[in-house]
């Protein structure tokens, strides 16, 4: 996505980031807003009234959008709100960041609802949200030649690099991220002719509520790299899997 080749995009790039109220999502909002070529950042959160840190960002290019990915009505309203702002320009980037991690203990009976929760948010909600924004992505692709979906995945979703479960019982999370990677691959093929690309990115082990403070990366270290990586994506990276440093990952 070489912006120099598309002068019409300068100061008009629109980016939607889900799960933007904290952690990696919040960090991505801050980092992407540092790019002067970005015109609008739509930061989605389940509950806008509780997104206090997000609300403290004073940049007028950022628009907070309330969206619960598990609610069809909420997703519909969010897309309508974004559409009102972007009009005929569409959405250039959709960053599916919202996610949960609910572990299971193999030494106890497994609760089906805990396993399902990982899939509901990490897979199903992402599919629903991506499809809902398809029209706006297609609009941008028709105007500029391409649009980009970015799925924030995890190395724990890599089947090739799996080392079994962990003491924290991450298997359901790993399964959901492996499924998300399949979604990335299929979207990259199914929407290729429309100019819509899709790529998975592993953000690293990050110091968030999910990752814990013992993690090796700060939010800024991870998201500053991801923000640069996102704008490097092009037709050669469609349907592939990278880490925050833009190194290729194995499925």
PLM-predicted stretches and their roles:
Residues 69-88:
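Conserved Rossmann-fold cofactor-binding substructure of NAD(P)-dependent oxidoreductases
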Residues 21-30:
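N-terminal Rossmann NAD(P)H-binding glycine-rich loop of SDR-like oxidoreductase domains
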Residues 74-77, 125-132:
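Conserved mid-core alpha-helix of short-chain dehydrogenase/reductase
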Residues 18, 90-99, 122, 151, ...:
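Rossmann-fold scaffold of SDR-type NAD(P)-dependent oxidoreductases
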Residues 33-52:
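Conserved glycine-rich Rossmann-like NAD(P)H-binding loop of the short-chain dehydrogenase/reductase
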